[in-house]
From Swiss-Prot:
Function text: RNA-binding nucleolar protein required for pre-rRNA processing. Involved in production of 18S rRNA and assembly of small ribosomal subunit.
Main location: nucleus
Presence of the UniProt keyword Repeat in the record: yes
GO cellular component term of the entry, any: 90S preribosome
One Gene Ontology MF term: RNA binding
The name this protein goes by in its record: Nucleolar protein 9
Similarity remark: Belongs to the NOP9 family.
Subcellular location: Nucleus, Nucleolus
Species annotation: Eremothecium gossypii (strain ATCC 10895 / CBS 109.51 / FGSC 9923 / NRRL Y-1056)
Domain of life of the organism encoding this protein: Eukaryota
Length: 678
């Protein structure tokens, strides 16, 4: 008989070797296989790659059902949910590492961590103690560790603000150390591997979160893009998991003093590792050039770069010398050839430009001015035309340089503004913001440049909505329920910024809106992005009364449908103020809503419009509603004077004609009667 071979035989052998059951003996065997204190994680160039085994069929089915139950979250009470979580934690004891490294069950671990109470959280933390390094390097387990760290930060703050000296425990409930001590114990486990974590695909995220917790910085949401924790790509992948953060995310936590000391010690340790033992605070010129070159490679590495950015951001908390900044950049006033070539790479590389853009925001103004004057001052326009690289650095310079340098950059960029906007709308927004910060510097020239681009005087078909928003090629009017694109959102925000910047843009936006067909205007009102532009145009104080009436003549006709729409309802709310001192239009809209009151009240959006328009008052106490309208008019137009009665002129009184209810000749009879009486 031929010798058996292949994957099926290997699977059978593995099954025989690692046969699982649900009894206590199996649990003891698992502990013997990978003991915490006897089997340190094997470290390779790619990090530890420990295999913790797999769950058997029964266990896998149980945890799958538990994950589905947690995802649906249809528990009748908080106590029922607590008991369920407790039972899952009990069943997972001894299997935490298998669960965390499983693609399916790691989601269950995260859900349990997010919903666990303080004792349950500590139990989970204790269960994976000693294996944080291994889990941090795993694709799925690293997310579990991140979620655990955020919840731990919240618990550390809670214990810090409300210390409990004698905890009352129920039954066999285990006594745990404080969360601070458990966290510090975990740090000691991770410290020997931190340099390697910096440029690891998964462990780098854990390390970044550690720095944020230790420095008491804001912990961003797990699905927030371009944050200190996640890239845009990572955010999209995270959203696919269908896990929602709890209230512990997206906020800052107070931390004990020991955390600052730990952070300082970690950064000192890393600096010495990168410089072959040199103490922090050493001048750039005294560090071995090979060490500088190696560290600069980390700065432009797509994985390590965000970590280095974060290190440079937090080092100023306790290091006045900014050792890591001075490791990257020289501190001399002369041009350094090697630094110049490094700067050129940063300004032309996508990862490098994002690194330079970020660290410029963290550095001292003096350090930024040095880089600007030595390597960028003479070629601002050239760098600004590098749409995906240098342009972002120039925008960062506009935000962080001194007034003199910013004005110099504006002098160079404003004449080229219309060209720069062809590929980078964000550049236009940043130039406008810089002009405002410098007291409307170059405002006239900016308005002129933007006017030529989006509303040319010599064009008969000029329309800023078409030229700026590109309505013709947009999703406006699509019947496929297409989502608005990111480009449409960017263009809409830019036009709103222009409208805020100068009245000229509001004026031409209103004119352009009125020049569109009514059907097109209403399509904009129901669009997820362009409705915000229409809403932004409706400014009662800045739009002429005649133009306000023309816009209202179009919008009021579909008031009921607008009120019942997610986007149109915001426009209806804006019309309440936009109709100030135009009471006839206000009452006309109120009557239209009143005629279809049932439809409006049955809509979640319509009910809000009904409330904001005070229509209950309009129905029951019309006089009080009109009084509220008058109060609003005084609030919107405080300088306007109420109509005054005409002053009587000092001229001889003329004989008045008889009133309508007075018969002819009655006045003479009255006079004769008075004379007869006399």
């Amino acid at each position: 008989m031929a010798k058996q071979r292949g994957r099926k035989l290997l699977q059978k052998q593995n099954k025989d070797d690692f046969k699982h059951s649900l009894d206590q003996e199996r649990h003891e065997e698992e502990v013997i296989q990978v003991p915490v204190d006897k089997a340190p994680a094997p470290i390779s160039a790619d990090g530890p790659n420990t295999f913790f085994g797999t769950l058997d069929t029964q266990e896998l089915e149980y945890f799958k059902r538990a994950e589905s139950t947690m995802a649906v979250d249809t528990f009748e009470s908080a106590d029922e949910k607590y008991q369920f979580i407790n039972s899952v934690i009990e069943e997972s004891k001894g299997k935490e590492l298998k669960l965390a490294t499983s693609q399916i069950c790691s989601k269950l671990m995260e859900r349990i961590i997010l919903a666990a109470d303080d004792q349950q959280l500590k139990a989970i933390f204790q269960g994976i103690n000693g294996f944080f390094v291994n889990l941090s390097y795993n694709k799925y387990a690293s997310h579990v560790v991140e979620t655990l760290l955020v919840r731990s930060a919240a618990l550390i703050e809670k214990e810090l603000l409300t210390p409990v000296f004698e905890a009352e425990l129920d039954g066999d409930e285990q006594v745990y150390a404080s969360m601070e001590n458990m966290f510090l114990f975990m740090l000691n486990e991770l410290k020997p591997h931190m340099k390697m974590m910096i440029n690891h695909q998964y462990a780098s995220h854990v390390f970044r979160l550690l720095i944020l917790v230790l420095s008491a910085k804001k912990l961003p949401k797990s699905t927030q893009s371009n944050s200190a924790l996640r890239s845009k790509k990572s955010k999209i992948a995270r959203k696919m998991v269908d896990l929602k953060d709890n209230a512990d995310f997206d906020r800052t936590y107070r931390t004990p003093d020991s955390f600052k000391l730990e952070l300082k010690g970690i950064l000192v340790m890393l600096y010495k590792q990168f410089t072959n033992g040199i103490e922090p605070g050493t001048k750039h010129s005294e560090v071995n050039i090979a060490c500088v070159t190696k560290f600069r490679e980390y700065c432009v590495d797509k994985v390590a770069s965000p970590v280095i950015q974060l290190i440079i951001q937090v080092e100023g908390i306790f290091d006045r010398d900014r050792s890591f900044w001075n490791l990257v950049f020289s501190n001399t006033e002369q041009n350094d050839p090697k630094e110049e070539s490094f700067m050129e790479y940063l300004l032309s590389d996508s990862v490098g430009s994002h690194f330079l853009q970020a660290v410029i925001g963290f550095a001292r103004t003096k350090q930024v001015e040095r880089l600007y004057k030595l390597y960028m001052q003479d070629r601002i326009v050239k760098l600004a035309k590098r749409d995906t690289t240098g342009a972002f650095v120039i925008m960062s310079l506009l935000q962080n340089l001194g007034s003199k340098e910013v004005k110099s950059i504006l002098d160079d960029l404003v004449p080229e503004l219309s060209i720069l906007l062809n590929s980078n709308l964000d550049f236009g927004s940043e130039i406008i913001e810089a002009s405002i910060r410098q007291g409307d510097y170059k405002k006239t020239e900016i308005v002129e440049q933007l006017g030529k681009k989006y509303y040319p005087a010599d064009s008969e078909s000029k329309n800023i909505l078409e030229s700026c928003l590109q309505l013709a090629s947009s999703t406006l009017g699509n019947t496929k329920d297409d989502w608005p694109t990111a480009d449409e959102r960017r263009r809409a925000l830019f036009l709103e910024k222009l409208i805020n910047f100068d009245d000229y843009f509001l004026e031409i936006a209103v004119e352009s809106l009125l020049n569109l067909p009514e059907e097109r205007i209403m399509q904009m009102c129901y669009h997820g992005v362009f409705s915000h532009v229409v809403e932004h145009v409706l400014q009662a104080k800045r739009v002429e009364t005649v133009k306000r009436k023309l816009l209202l003549n179009i919008l009021y006709k579909d008031a009921v449908n607008l009120a019942c729409n997610a986007y149109g309802s915001h426009i209806m709310d804006k019309l309440w103020e936009f109709t100030a001192k135009l009471t006839l239009y206000k009452e006309r809209i109120a009557n239209l809503l009143l005629e279809e009151a049932d439809k409006v009240k049955n809509s979640i959006y319509g009910r809000q419009v009904w409330k904001n328009w005070h229509l209950e008052l309009y129905v029951r106490k019309r006089f009080d509603w009109r009084k509220k309208v008058k109060e609003q008019e005084l609030e919107v137009f405080p300088d306007s004077k109420p109509l005054q009665p005409k002053q009587k002129e000092s001229i001889p009184a003329k004989r008045s004609a008889p009133s309508n209810n007075q018969r002819p000749g009655s006045l003479n009879k009255k006079r004769n009667a008075e004379k007869h009486h006399t």
